[in-house]
A protein has these predicted regions:
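Anion-binding and metal-coordination hotspots
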Residues: 1-269
Length: 269
């Protein structure tokens, strides 16, 4: 609940993560805020941002301003590997066919440790993990479908090569191992599955393998939402706060549509 009170427009070539601190400082300068709860999507999570938020909190306290800076930040999928142990530990005791929310800790290494420090600063942060079985099932099924289609294609080309080696003749140009490798590799790459299906481009014969350990790990990630937070709210409430961000994004889409109706795209003669 609440009403939007302000917005700012940043240069289009400015990375999203670099807008976080300036925006918070601007709000604190404009309004007598006592508590700030930052809820942001995956583009804003960085250890540097978390460290800077802690420094800003300390600076405000030194100035005598009693301002609480809290955050709920989503972990980008590309960084899920940093949380593999926490994911396995939390998911291991949970059902896969029911929604659940759990919490654990994440040890982050500060990138702003002074050069004189003998070891980088390690900070314990609260990590909330949520599982949506419906989303997990959709993603797993979609991936499995793509994998099976590629495997069928690979088996088809492998069968043609074996038949050619046995003396069978077919219409058109004969299929070569190098040609099959190149075509299959591009098919796998186009399906965004090169991290799962490995095509041996250096081998003389056409061959490929599936990384089953990686496949099981991706199935573990399916349907998961990872949130880093310093709030004291219950884990389920943290998840709900983050999901309310969708309402804000929906409002942005509506505003953008209204703006596009107006003649704002002018060109000079």
């Amino acid at each position: 609940e609440g009403l939007p009170i302000a917005h700012e427009v940043h240069p289009g070539n400015l990375a999203e993560a670099k807008t976080l601190l300036p925006m918070i400082k601007s709000l604190l300068a404009r309004y007598p805020l006592k508590r700030v709860v930052l809820v942001a999507d995956r583009g804003l999570l960085s250890v540097n941002n978390l460290d800077e938020l802690a420094k800003l909190q300390a600076a405000l306290a030194a100035e005598g301003r009693a301002v609480s800076l809290e955050y709920v930040l989503a972990v980008p999928a590309a960084r899920y590997g940093d949380f593999a142990e926490a994911l396995r530990a939390s998911a291991g005791s949970q059902p896969t066919d029911k929604p659940w929310v759990a919490e654990t800790t994440w040890e982050s290494t500060s990138k702003s440790s002074p050069p004189s420090a003998s070891a980088p600063t390690v900070t314990q942060r609260r990590l909330v993990i949520a599982h949506d079985p419906e989303v997990a099932e959709r993603r797993t099924q979609a991936r499995d479908k793509s994998i099976q289609e590629l495997l069928a294609l690979g088996e088809q080309w492998g069968g043609k090569l074996d038949a050619q080696d046995a003396g069978a003749r077919r219409r058109g140009r004969p299929l070569s191992d190098s040609g099959a490798k190149a075509r299959f590799y591009h098919a796998v790459k186009d399906a965004n599955l090169a991290h799962l299906i490995k095509v041996d481009l250096q081998a003389e014969a056409f061959s490929f393998t599936i990384d089953e350990d990686k496949q099981r790990y991706l199935e573990l990630l399916d349907g998961k939402l990872l949130l880093v937070t310093n709030t004291d709210a219950p884990a389920a409430e943290v998840v709900q706060r983050y999901k309310s961000l969708a309402d804000i994004e929906r409002g942005f889409r509506v505003l953008k549509s209204d703006i596009e109706i107006d003649p704002v795209y002018h060109r000079l003669p």
